[in-house]
């Protein structure tokens, strides 16, 4: 496995490669990331993974505790990626990605990036889209792999490549969950055992809505919100039933008769967790 820390080293490493699959990450890797690599490995001659904690997608452009406290464990991440079968790792520092300071030209995500997660984290998806566009330009992948846990990110990236005519196929990969049902996330490392137990109310509420839909029962989204809002140690950010492509909230009057996604975010202590499930 090659490790490139500069753009030029990455470009050199990619010379003469055939089909390329890209797995963009911010490090602090877990089994969910390994599943992305597995999917990329099955469809491409060469698999590239990036590790970069992107300040542009954090509050105050990284001048915040969430960015400073984000887990960084490069040696462990490299070991996981090598075992998973990655060929090339791109692990630049901030100066390499943004030489001379923050970029003047950004990818602006408009309405799809300002609702749900974007409403709670203004500018987040502009930062995501900007760094992903840079990675696409550097790697020139045939396919790129993203976890379905970040459903809005997948929708934003799909729109990015469609609107800017970037020739890459976007491949969402299903959510990986722990034995207790909690969606795998790098932020889970910051939960105590008690906080992890409290966080389980989110996947439980989501799966409850899914069961009601499968049984042909009416969905009580407000009741689901109330359950989350009243749970011990939990603060509700949002819970919505949305169109899977546009993420526009769906007005549910009785039974749900169209494909939909229920997306939610909660705080457990200082840790913000997201999850979603198909209905």
Curated annotation (Swiss-Prot):
It is an enzyme of class 6 (ligase). It catalyses: (R)-pantoate + beta-alanine + ATP = (R)-pantothenate + AMP + diphosphate + H(+). It comes from the Bacteria. GO terms for molecular function: ATP binding; pantoate-beta-alanine ligase activity. ATP binds at residues 26-33, 147-150, 176, 184-187. InterPro entries: Pantoate_ligase (IPR003721), Pantoate_ligase_C (IPR042176), Rossmann-like_a/b/a_fold (IPR014729). Pathway: Cofactor biosynthesis; (R)-pantothenate biosynthesis; (R)-pantothenate from (R)-pantoate and beta-alanine: step 1/1. Beta-alanine binds at residue 57. Homodimer. Catalyzes the condensation of pantoate with beta-alanine in an ATP-dependent reaction via a pantoyl-adenylate intermediate. This is Pantothenate synthetase. It comes from Corynebacterium glutamicum (strain ATCC 13032 / DSM 20300 / JCM 1318 / BCRC 11384 / CCUG 27702 / LMG 3730 / NBRC 12168 / NCIMB 10025 / NRRL B-2784 / 534).
